[in-house]
Amino acid sequence: MTALVKPDNSAHWYTEDGEPRHTRKNGKPTTLKDARVEGLYPSVTSILNIVSKPALESWKIEQGILSALSLDRNKDESIDGFAKRVVDNMKEMASAAPNFGTRVHHVLEQYNLSAAEPDEDDELYGWFKEYKFWFDQHITKVYEAETVLVNNQHGYAGTVDLVADHVQWGRCVIDFKTQGVKRKARFYDTWVQQLAAYQKCVEGDPGC
């Protein structure tokens, strides 16, 4: 059987001025070799992807099992053929979560920058309404929203969701996360590490 799941070696790269260089002019992803030649900085998330994430790996395995259980093997379908369909289905299911997160981030960005609100019949309005209540109660000034931050001293960069003044904590670096919450929300060490990395890109030692 040929390899069904290939490792994802993609990464995000930036120039020292914060310009994204995730892809080449031909549309292909920027490789590590390209980055070394051009002196590009890796993103914070690309660096953190090196760290093992047991919870994420368990979730991926779970998605594969669910895909295998939910699909019926076609008559005369080979093991390889069925396995490929399982992997394709697993990838489709797994991509739904980040796609949802991207849409939520866009809605929040619009409100952070211009107080623009989605229509009440928008499927994301319920999530936005909860965020708006929190924002209006706690945020007094927005400095940056969906902005690339660069640390030239240590050679990394990344896109921060929000840098703003909080009524209790003062100037803060804020990152939004979406997840399927069951009994309670889950929190991971890499989230703290990501915030700490962004914090070192902002003058004045903000909170996070």
Which sequence ranges carry the predicted segments?
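Metal-dependent nuclease catalytic cores that hydrolyze phosphodiester bonds in DNA/RNA
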Residues: 1-157
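Mg2+/Mn2+-dependent nuclease catalytic core
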Residues: 146-208
